[in-house]
């Protein structure tokens, strides 16, 4: 091996090292540029921020209406139950009256 080939081998090693470092720097820069482009191209969140409060208000109103509906359903069930009791009382009263009429007819 001659001095020239040793120098050439050393030169190639230096060039390869410098080239590898340059590629690494370029990869890091490309990645940073890509991330910056992604962030800058996503647009603003103004429209999301604008709708967030109305969605929150809508959710609150919906919860309020659900509570009112539950109360009304409870009152409706209670009214239906009371009406059923009244019907049963009326039917029982009718049976008592009919029984008294039958008993009075039999006695005459």
Curated annotation (Swiss-Prot):
GO terms for cellular component: extracellular region; pilus. Residues 41-73 are annotated as: Disordered. It is found in: Secreted; Fimbrium. Residues 41-56 have a biased composition (Polar residues). Its main location: secreted. Keywords: Fimbrium, Secreted, Virulence. Major structural protein of the hrp pilus, which is a component of the type III secretion system (T3SS, Hrp secretion system) required for effector protein delivery, parasitism, and pathogenicity. The hrp pilus functions as a conduit for protein delivery into the host cell. Also, affects the expression of T3SS-associated genes. Required for full expression of genes that encode regulatory, secretion, and effector proteins of the T3SS. HrpA-mediated gene regulation apparently is through effect on the mRNA level of HrpR and HrpS. Belongs to the HrpA type 1 family. This is Hrp pili protein HrpA.
């Amino acid at each position: 091996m001659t001095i020239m080939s040793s120098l050439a081998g050393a030169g190639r090693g230096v060039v390869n090292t410098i080239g590898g470092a340059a590629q690494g720097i370029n990869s890091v820069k490309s990645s940073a540029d890509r991330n910056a482009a992604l962030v800058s191209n996503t647009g603003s969140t103004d429209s999301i921020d604008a709708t967030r409060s109305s969605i929150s208000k809508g959710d609150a109103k919906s919860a309020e209406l659900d509570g009112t509906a539950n109360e009304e359903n409870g009152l409706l069930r209670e009214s239906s139950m009371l009406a059923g009791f009244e019907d049963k009382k009326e039917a029982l009263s009718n049976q008592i009256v009919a029984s008294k009429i039958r008993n009075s007819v039999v006695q005459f």
